[in-house]
Amino acid sequence: MNPNQKIITIGSICMVVGIISLMLQIGNIISVWVSHIIQTWHPNQPEPCNQSINFYTEQAAASVTLAGNSSLCPISGWAIYSKDNSIRIGSKGDVFVIREPFISCSHLECRTFFLTQGALLNDKHSNGTVKDRSPYRTLMSCPVGEAPSPYNSRFESVAWSASACHDGISWLTIGISGPDNGAVAVLKYNGIITDTIKSWRNNILRTQESECACVNGSCFTVMTDGPSNEQASYKIFKIEKGRVVKSVELNAPNYHYEECSCYPDAGEITCVCRDNWHGSNRPWVSFNQNLEYQIGYICSGVFGDSPRPNDGTGSCGPVSLNGAYGVKGFSFKYGNGVWIGRTKSTSSRSGFEMIWDPNGWTETDSSFSLKQDIIAITDWSGYSGSFIQHPELTGLNCMRPCFWVELIRGRPKEKTIWTSGSSISFCGVNSDTVGWSWPDGADLPFTIDK
C-alpha cells in the first residue's frame, strides 16, 4: 500500500468512528427527551423511592417545687455516695485546681460545685493557689463523682465564696467576688443575673461554701461580713426566683457564724456553722420561712470544730478552750440528738469521723453511742458540709441527709507549689454500713513541683 492509500484508509476509519460517536450522542439526547415527555404526561406517577419525614418534638424536663416539708429520714449510719479522685487523675489529666467543693441536688441530679483557681493541676499557673481570694476564681460545677475538668464542667459564676441550690425549677447560684473592702454577691437564676448583694460592713463579705436550702419555692442562705476573729455581722436572706425578697440581721452578741451548712427539715431551716473567733463547738441558727429565728451552740461535750480540746464537758454557749480558728463543718439535729461530723485530729485538718450523740443537741456530757470512721487520722481531710436529697429525687417520704468531705492536698502542709483538693460524700441510710478510710490517695509531689 502506497502512502496515498494509507492516508485515505486512516481518514476513512476516523470518519466512521466520528459518525458512530455522533449517532450515540443523538441517541442519548432522544432518550432524555422521551423520558421528559413521559414524566410530563404522567405527573401523578409515584416516585421510584419512598420519602419519609421525621418529626422531632423537644420535651422539657418536668419542673416541680421542692417542698422541703418532710422530716429528715431516720438513719443508722452512712453509706458512701461518691469519690472523685481528682488529684490522682490530675497528675496526668486536665483537672482543675480547686478548693471548697460542695454538693447540691435537684429533683433530677446531684452536682459537685467547686471554686476553681483558673488553673490546671501540674501546670505553671497552679503556683500560688494557696491564696483564698483572687480575680481568677470561679464557681463551676460537674456531675457528682467526676473529676472537675474543662471537658465536663459548667461555668456558674465568678466567685471566691459561693453557694448554690435548686428550687425544683432552676438552679440558684450565689457568687461573691471583688475587693475585701467592697465585695458583691451576684445572684443568678437559671444562669441569668437576677440580683446583687453589696458588702454591708466592707470586711470580706462571705457565704456558706455549701448548698443553700429551698422550701416551697423559696431559697435561704446565710452571709457573714466583718472580722474573722471577733464579733461580726450575720444575715439570713430569703430568695425567690433569684431575687432577695427579705433579709434579717441576727441579733447574736458573742456569737460567731461563718461558712454555715444549712438544710431543710419539716419546713424549717437549720444551719450549723463555724465559730472562727472563740468556740470549739459549733454555733447553730434555725429559722422558719418568715425568717423568725433561734440561735445557740451545740451543747455536746463531743466537740465538732478543729482545733478543739479533748472531749469533756460541753456548753450551750461557746467553748473557748482552743476555740480560735476553725474549719467548715456540719451536724444533723434529730430531736435532742445530733450526728456530729468532725476531723479525727484535735489540732489539724486530718482524718474524719461521724459520731451519734443521742442527747448532744441539748446536753453537755461527752458520751456517745455510735462512731463511724470516714478518713484515717494519717490522711488529710479539710472542709465538710451537708446536703439533702429531696423526696422528689429519692422517692422516699423523707429528706435524706448527706455530707461531703474535702480532702485538701498541697500547700501549706505538703511540698508543692499548689493547693487543691478532691472530695468524697456519704448519705444516711437505715441499713448496713461500714467504717473505713477513703483518703485522697495521690502520690506527691507532681512533676511541676520538682
Curated annotation (Swiss-Prot):
Entries under InterPro entries matching the protein: Glyco_hydro_34 (IPR001860), Sialidase_Influenza_A/B (IPR033654), Sialidase_sf (IPR036278)
Residues binding substrate: 99, 133, 258-259, 274, 349
Hypervariable stalk region as annotated region, ranges: 36-71
PTM: N-glycosylated.
Head of neuraminidase as annotated region, ranges: 72-450
Gene Ontology MF: a single term: exo-alpha-sialidase activity
Membrane topology: Single-pass type II membrane protein
Its job: Catalyzes the removal of terminal sialic acid residues from viral and cellular glycoconjugates. Cleaves off the terminal sialic acids on the glycosylated HA during virus budding to facilitate virus release. Additionally helps virus spread through the circulation by further removing sialic acids from the cell surface. These cleavages prevent self-aggregation and ensure the efficient spread of the progeny virus from cell to cell. Otherwise, infection would be limited to one round of replication.
Domain commentary: Intact N-terminus is essential for virion morphogenesis. Possesses two apical sorting signals, one in the ectodomain, which is likely to be a glycan, and the other in the transmembrane domain. The transmembrane domain also plays a role in lipid raft association.
Name of the protein described by the UniProt record: Neuraminidase
